[in-house]
């Protein structure tokens, strides 16, 4: 396994819409394993392939307290269950050190393929439902800051630009 580099906002590659995975093969499984290692190393609960500059519809996540329940979502599709929405504090490995409340569907129905290409379905609520929607947005080239007001989004952009300058000067 290998740790991958996570792209950071405002990198335009984060805006790329991911293409479906045609075949789940050894290359796909290696990507999944590398993404899980990267996510765990970065202390995240979810990671989309777009965030590591691979523009395929692959997501990994683990919202368990003890980091023991990795989930793999290949070619995911979700549907909100009902109209009820709930704001929840979100962060993002591509926008480090910034958090904001984002309203999302309270419950979702998910269809995806697992690490071996087997189809599965599940219904999710709470943190898992939020994480599914957040990571799915990455596959569409959407970031959680896109849900914020222009003023707040501009503040995040300035903060990230300052962070990048500081990293270059170091």
From Swiss-Prot:
The active site is at 135. CDD domains: Pep_deformylase. Its EC number is 3.5.1.88. One of its GO terms (molecular function) is metal ion binding. InterPro entries: Peptide_deformylase (IPR023635), Peptide_deformylase_sf (IPR036821). Gene3D superfamilies: Peptide deformylase. Fe cation binds at residues 92, 134, 138. Its cofactor is Fe(2+). Binds 1 Fe(2+) ion. GO terms for biological process: co-translational protein modification; translation. It comes from the Bacteria. It is an enzyme of class 3 (hydrolase). Pfam families: Pep_deformylase. Removes the formyl group from the N-terminal Met of newly synthesized proteins. Requires at least a dipeptide for an efficient rate of reaction. N-terminal L-methionine is a prerequisite for activity but the enzyme has broad specificity at other positions. PANTHER family: PEPTIDE DEFORMYLASE (PTHR10458:SF21). Belongs to the polypeptide deformylase family. This is Peptide deformylase. The gene is def.
């Amino acid at each position: 396994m290998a740790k991958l580099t996570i792209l950071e906002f405002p990198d335009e590659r984060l805006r790329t819409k991911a293409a479906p995975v045609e075949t789940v093969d050894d290359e796909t499984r290696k990507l999944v394993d590398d993404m899980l290692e990267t996510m765990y190393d970065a202390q995240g609960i979810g990671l989309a392939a777009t965030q590591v500059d691979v523009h395929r519809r692959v997501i990994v996540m683990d919202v368990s307290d003890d980091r023991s329940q990795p989930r793999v979502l290949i070619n995911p599709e979700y549907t909100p269950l009902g109209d009820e929405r709930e704001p929840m504090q979100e962060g993002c490995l591509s926008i480090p050190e910034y958090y904001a409340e984002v309203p999302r569907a309270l419950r979702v129905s998910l269809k995806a393929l697992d690490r071996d290409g087997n189809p599965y379905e599940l219904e999710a609520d709470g943190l898992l439902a939020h994480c599914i929607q957040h990571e799915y947005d990455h596959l569409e080239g959407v970031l959680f800051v896109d849900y914020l007001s222009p003023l707040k989004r501009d503040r995040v952009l300035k903060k990230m630009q300052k962070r990048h300058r500081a990293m270059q000067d170091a």
